Swiss-Prot record:
One of its GO terms (molecular function) is structural constituent of ribosome. Residues 22-85 form the S5 DRBM domain. Belongs to the universal ribosomal protein uS5 family. GO terms for cellular component: small ribosomal subunit. This is Small ribosomal subunit protein uS5. PROSITE patterns: RIBOSOMAL_S5 (PS00585), S5_DSRBD (PS50881). The keyword Ribosomal protein applies. It comes from Rhizobium johnstonii (strain DSM 114642 / LMG 32736 / 3841). Keywords: Ribonucleoprotein, Ribosomal protein, RNA-binding, rRNA-binding. HAMAP family: Ribosomal_uS5_B.
């Protein structure tokens, strides 16, 4: 029962190719302490956001005794937890959404072309790795980076593509788009 073994180099190359499609941003790094019998044992905790800049994004948390190891663990955790977010024209949200985690609350609004990413701190990292170019975001409550990232992901998970809304309402997607563009033109006048 001889099994065919693939060369290890090929596995490493495919892993590097897979990793190269992602962009990662370090959001926060904290020094943490574990109290043990002999005193305190120090380590580091890292929060990383990973995305492919095409609508997939994830975040991860990692802890280790050394900073690079904590970042590596957080990056691996983020790649395991990717979500897909439908983007309008590949640059902004389809509709405004609210998100919440703990005491952190965020409001994400779609924006016109050329607006840019108007968001603070941890939210900006999420939008940049997601591939979003135009968005306005406001955070209230907790400014803890962990809560802000989780609240942003909560909001992004509530993002619904207009095709899904049209299917739920039992109307054609083109009809929904026509209504949307008609209401958009009326509000600009």
């Amino acid at each position: 029962m001889a099994q065919e073994r693939r060369p290890q180099r090929d596995d490493r190359q495919s892993r590097e190719e897979r990793d190269s499609e992602f962009v990662d941003k370090l959001v926060a790094i904290n020094r943490v302490a574990k109290v043990v019998k002999g005193g305190r044992r120090f380590g580091f905790a890292a929060l990383v956001v990973v995305g492919d800049q095409k609508g997939r994004v994830g975040f991860g948390h990692g802890k280790a005794r050394e900073v690079p190891e904590a970042i590596r663990k957080a990056t691996e955790a983020a790649k395991r937890e990717l979500i897909f977010v439908p983007l309008r024209d590949g640059r902004t949200l389809h509709h405004d959404v609210h998100g919440r985690h703990g005491a952190g609350k965020v409001l994400l609004r779609s924006a016109k072309v050329g607006t840019g990413i108007i968001a603070g701190g941890p939210m900006r990292a999420v939008f940049e790795t997601l591939g979003m170019h135009d968005v306005v975001a406001k955070s209230t409550g907790s400014s803890n980076p962990y809560n802000m990232v989780r609240a942003t992901f909560d909001a992004l998970k509530h993002q619904v593509h207009p095709k899904d809304i049209a299917a739920q309402r039992g109307i054609k997607y083109a009809t929904l788009q026509a209504r949307r563009s008609a209401s958009g033109n009326a509000s600009e006048e």
